[in-house]
């Protein structure tokens, strides 16, 4: 539904989505340690807001499709995230499951992490110029502690 931009259908499917195994632990640590976070998405803000609310994600900021131009792979959305986070690129880390996530992070001089669970771009992502590669959500903890 998201790829077809059928947002009403996408909204209705959110309750059918589940967090990946290990993600609840990661989110609890982010929440308990007050780690400042931002979602940078190519989806519209309404969709991202609904996902954040449904899963009660500990997210302080969102940069959605219409919030920065040009969109990923351009660094503009990542630079907007740094501005919202009041953070320098050298102090940030970015996790993404698409090549454009890695490209945008790298272009903004942000340490990039390729996330290989659930990606539909595995063969492309493996050849992207990421700083780190991880295969499960729990590995996020080794990079944010």
Predicted segments with their positions:
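Conserved phosphate-coupling serine/threonine residues in phosphotransfer and NTP-handling enzymes
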Residues: 41-43
């Amino acid at each position: 539904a998201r790829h077809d931009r059928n947002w009403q259908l996408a909204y209705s499917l959110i309750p059918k989505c589940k967090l990946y195994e290990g993600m609840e632990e990661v989110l609890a640590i982010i929440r308990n340690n007050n780690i400042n976070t931002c979602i940078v998405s190519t989806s519209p803000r309404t969709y991202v807001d609904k996902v954040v609310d449904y899963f009660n994600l500990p997210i302080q900021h969102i940069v959605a499709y219409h919030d920065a131009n040009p969109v990923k792979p351009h660094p503009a959305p990542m630079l907007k995230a740094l501005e919202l986070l009041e953070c320098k690129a050298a102090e940030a880390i970015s996790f993404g499951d698409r090549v454009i996530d890695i490209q945008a992070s790298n272009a903004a001089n942000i340490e990039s992490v390729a996330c290989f669970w659930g990606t539909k771009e595995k063969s492309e992502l493996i050849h992207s110029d990421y700083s780190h590669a991880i295969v499960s959500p729990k590995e996020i903890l080794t990079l944010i502690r």
